[in-house]
Amino acid sequence: MQNPREGMDLPQVIFSLVFIFIMIISSLWIMRPFFLGFAWASMVVVATWPIFLKLQILLWGNRACAVVMMTFSLLLVFIIPIVCLVNSLIDNSTSVISWLSSDKFRFPSLEWLQDIPIIGIKLFSSYQKLLNEGGAELITKVQPYMGKTTEFFVIQAGHFGRFILHLIFMLIFSALLYWNGEKVQSVIRHFAIRLGSKSGDSVVLLAGQAIRAVALGVVVTALVQGILSGIGLAISGIPYSSLLMMLIIIFCLVQLGPLPVLIPAIIWLYWNGKTTWGTVLLIWSCVVCILDHILRPILIRIGVDLPTVLILSGVIGGLIAFGMIGLFIGPVVLIISYRLISSWMDEIPAPNSLSKKSVQQLLFKKKN
């Protein structure tokens, strides 16, 4: 019997593997500038693919018009608001820095503290004592750091050229994926089937459902909370409400919620004696926070029938591990792992559940 290893040329195998490895690394290195844009485009296209198909039907089956409309919609949703936000931040930075560094920056009197029952007068006297004894020194120490901190954030916001470039790549790749969506899906599913047979195909379909669930449950909820919070801030008279609204949306995406922005805004209103508007914003903030616990689980269930805790854990962990793109990568990885483990366990039937009486009988027999 002939040994199959006799015809194996070991140096040829080694050089072939080294060559394949070098080609893969070189290809990845060449495509490295496009990874982030392509990843975002993939997530956006998968999340909005049902909308794209419905739009194509409304346009009498014209794929080109549907691609143009969806790309233009993405342009309106992503590029224009971000450019306007950064320009507004840069334009208003000079006045903010000068105000923080000037002598006009003073702590308010907080006379409304006296109206608080029982402890109001004591709080007001303690606050006035703090201002009289150490307020000036505190302001002197805080002012340089506040100005420098604001300047740092403004400088970082000014370097948004690379970010805009990634967004442009995202738009280009999104248009290409919309145009060839079925072909790309077929190639990915074929590759998955080659790796894992039928389970590989189900993993690809599950990944698409997970991305849509995150887009519906997390992104849509963050947008709704941000818009409602921005309306409340604007009505209450909070300055720079549009900038704060964008900040709230970011906080909601990273699962911190709107309270890190709304609570300081409420304190600022009470601080400046606007108790009525402070109370209004407080009630509105409670409504916005309650909406998060109602809307998000419903939207996630629409996208995929999986545990909400699993998706939210993936969102938070993915953000910490991969940044903003981890918002989608984290849930996809956890959900795929969850389904693979579940399907592997389901290959063997689960043990029969025993009643309390049966368990006691078994324990009694063992003792005897």
UniProtKB/Swiss-Prot annotation:
InterPro entries: AI-2E-like
Keywords: Cell membrane, Membrane, Transmembrane, Transmembrane helix, Transport
Compartments (UniProt record): Cell membrane
Membrane in keyword set: yes
Segments crossing the lipid bilayer: 13-35, 39-61, 68-90, 159-181, 216-238, 248-270, 277-299, 314-336
Superkingdom to which the source organism belongs: Bacteria
Membrane topology of this protein: Multi-pass membrane protein
A Pfam family that the UniProt record links to this protein: AI-2E_transport
Coiled coil: none
Annotated Gene Ontology cellular component terms: plasma membrane
Family that this chain belongs to: Belongs to the autoinducer-2 exporter (AI-2E) (TC 2.A.86) family.
PANTHER family: TRANSMEMBRANE PROTEIN, TRANSPORT PROTEIN YDIK-RELATED
This protein's name: Putative transport protein bbp_117
